[in-house]
Amino acid sequence: MKQLTIEAFKAMLDNALKQIKAREEEFSKLDAVIGDGDHGTAIVAAMTAVNKSAQSGTEFKQMLGDMGMDVMMEVSGSTSTLLGAFFLGMSDHAEGTELDAAGVKVMFAGGLANVQQQTQAKRGDKTMMDALIPAVEAMQACTSDDIKEVLNAGAKAALDGAEATVPMKANFGRCLLYTSPSPR
């Protein structure tokens, strides 16, 4: 894919919501080990708000900005704050109705930069940053002009980064209170 259109991006968001909904119970069970067990419900609510907001989008900047604001206004908690910051950062670095691979890379880097302004967490702290930072770095390093290859490089790095957190000691959030190895 040489161009990412608004419609293709919306389809990706729809697919992401379906995947998250399918794992809602799993996410809540994992969260219940150290928290209140509502993460599955919260992330589904956040992605539902994102998808609802995206449906009226006609160009990237406006759509991503609306997605960021809506998720922060409609869903409480750190997940929605950080997800909102990510989309708002993306919106500052995306123009028009189509993006090429270079534009996608710039958009994701803008999202990461904005999240980094909202949190002190960094790679190695056992947070979402352990997946997000390597994902964006891998996307930047990908030399292909095929957007699917760029996104796949980011997805693989995100998964590897998340899996690398299993033996880590947390430096933020409720995980600070949990000393056993991460549940799988």
Regions found by a protein language model. Name each.
Residues 2, 27, 61-64, 101, ...:
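Non-transmembrane, aqueous-exposed alpha-helical and coiled segments at domain scale
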